[in-house]
A protein has these predicted regions:
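Small-residue (G/A/S/T)-rich helix-start motifs and N-terminal tracts that mark the onset
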Residues: 1-80, 189-342, 346, 350-367, ...
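Short beta->alpha connector loops at strand-helix junctions that form conserved
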Residues: 83-85, 113-116, 183, 296-299, ...
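Short, small-residue-enriched loops and turns at beta-alpha junctions
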Residues: 87-89, 129-131, 323-324, 350-351
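Glycine-rich, charge-decorated loop segments at or immediately adjacent to ligand/cofactor-binding or catalytic sites
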Residues: 93, 159-173, 349-361
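Amphipathic alpha-helical segments in well-structured domains
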Residues: 95, 99, 139-143, 176, ...
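Internal gly/pro-rich beta-alpha loop/helix module
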Residues: 120-121, 126-218
Length: 502
């Protein structure tokens, strides 16, 4: 995979230090390049009729801000500087250097926040990635004032008040229209609620690249559309067996739709053959809705199920399954006897949550796809506690049970047992609809029988699921989207993949 690294505040500080200490690039050079990069973006967006104001703290983020103000003035723009701690407050070494340089030029400094609020563009350089406390008191008053101003708001690296690691909002927080972050996106810019304060996020190169990791690569990454080019083209000399056989164990009385959605999504993701195990009462519905699917009904013994498992290359189990005694038998048999990879979703997870020892029974690679409620039951943690550290919780679960965990939320987190994690950046709020998770399980299962790699199937599956939703958003909007629309969007995704691949 081609991967975009996502870093924490501490990882970014280590990169800064490594670039300076190992590669001998002075910190002030990095700061100047950071400022110049932000100014290039601003000049591309705003003409010289606009007046700028930079609000500064007293750390290195403020140093970036002062350098930005100086470069804007030197480029012929009107820009004022506001020191939130006052002009006499001492700060970091680089802050003091930039402050002195700015003073030598004699560019404008103001002490009245009302002057700042009258400008056209307000740039936040109060706090950077190191902030770990709530913004209160007079600093909160400053941020509150500029948030109310009739101006564009730009954040330098991270909006002040956003935790750069976990996306928490700490006290009064700067509400940006644009965030120019340095070298790599920070995890907190992508997670809720911090992402709501970032506006459009753009990475500004400053001279730090992957060399500065010195082999210690970040554990969190993201996929984008360019990664889809890495999916293999389907060979011309192929048949339905070439693309794998998926067994979907899904549906119960009044829940036939879950089986249809999952199986159809698997077919639409390229699986060669899909067989559904479901109660006999669902037969007519499924055969009408998805005539392409093979059907096996009323499996009521472990022996009968084992025969079907021998047919398949992978299993999806759980969508609409219920928690009946027969459903419990199906889940237990699959976990204890299957010698093929598994995708465990929905009611299968709810059954497991009542007996977590079941998850230690699996012989083959497993992908679990819980939403927050299901993860709460699995981990015996509140949803609030999970949301406070969603990446950490997904990673903990993956490691504890040796599975790949697809933890579904506003930003779905994919965590592998080896410690590698992905943040999915595709998708939209229209996808928060009944059956969306069934579609995801089918996509992941469909990819799994082709890729034979749980990590890739989970990561690509989550991304493609979101991208399919994005593809149909213009037709449905957020109110009108239903799970079947997401399946329709898969056609557009694969057409794009094949065109780009060729």
């Amino acid at each position: 995979m081609i991967l975009e690294y996502i870093v924490t505040g501490n990882e970014m500080k280590l990169l800064d230090d490594t670039t300076s200490q190992v590669f001998l690039v002075p910190s002030v050079v990095l700061m100047e390049q950071a400022a110049a990069g932000v100014v290039r973006e601003l000049v591309a967006c705003f003409d010289k009729s606009k007046e700028f104001a930079v609000i500064c703290g007293k750390g290195n983020n403020a140093g970036d801000g002062i350098a930005i103000a100086r470069l804007l003035n030197q480029a012929g723009y009107r820009c004022m500087l506001y020191y939130a701690f006052g002009t006499d407050e001492a700060g970091s070494e680089l802050f003091e250097l930039q402050k002195n340089i700015y003073a030598r030029y004699g560019f404008k400094v103001v002490s009245d926040i009302e002057c700042v609020c009258k400008s056209d563009v307000i740039i936040d350089a109060l706090f950077g990635t190191g902030l770990k406390r709530a913004i209160e008191g007079s600093l909160a008053d400053v941020i509150s004032a500029v948030n109310k101003a009739n101006a564009y708001r730009v954040a330098v690296d991270v909006p002040s008040g956003v935790d750069s690691d976990k996306g928490h909002v700490m006290g009064c927080t700067f509400k940006a229209d644009f965030t120019y972050t340095f070298s790599y996106k920070k995890t907190g810019l992508l997670l809720w609620p911090g992402c709501d304060y970032c506006g459009l996020v753009k990475v500004v190169p400053i001279g730090i690249d992957d060399h500065s990791f010195c082999g210690n690569l970040p554990s969190v990454r993201a996929l984008d559309e360019s990664d889809l080019k890495k999916l293999d083209n389907r060979p011309a000399h192929s048949n339905k067996g070439t693309f794998g056989k998926l067994l979907v164990i899904a549906g119960s009385r009044n829940m036939a739709g879950a089986a249809v959605l999952s199986a159809k999504a698997a077919y639409k993701s390229g699986a060669g053959l899909v067989k559904i195990i479901t109660p006999e009462c669902n037969r007519s519905i499924i055969q009408c809705a998805l005539p392409e699917a093979l059907l096996c009904t009323d499996i009521t013994s472990a022996k009968a199920l084992e025969t079907e498992l021998d047919w398949a290359d992978a299993v999806v189990i759980g969508p609409g399954l219920s928690k009946s005694d027969n459903a419990k038998m199906l889940v237990e048999t699959v976990l204890k006897t299957a010698e093929i990879p598994l995708v465990i979703d929905a009611d299968a997870l709810n059954i497991i949550s009542d007996n977590m020892t079941l998850l230690n029974e699996h012989k083959m690679p497993v992908i679990v796809t819980p939403h927050l409620g299901e993860m709460s039951r699995l981990m015996k943690k509140s949803i609030v506690n999970i949301q406070e550290d969603i990446i950490g919780v997904a990673g903990e679960f993956a490691s504890l049970y040796n599975v790949t965990c697809v933890l579904k939320d506003f930003r779905t987190i994919i965590a592998a047992a080896d410690g590698e994690k992905f943040i999915n950046l595709s998708g939209n709020c229209g996808m928060a609809t009944a059956g969306s998770g069934d579609v995801l399980s089918g996509i992941v299962g469909g990819l799994l029988v082709q890729l034979r790699d749980t990590k890739k199937a989970a990561a690509y599956g989550a991304f493609i699921h979101g991208l399919a939703g994005d593809m149909v958003f213009d037709n449905t909007g957020s109110y009108g989207m239903i799970a079947s629309d997401i399946i329709d969007g898969l056609d557009k995704v694969w057409i794009k993949v094949e065109k780009n691949g060729n």
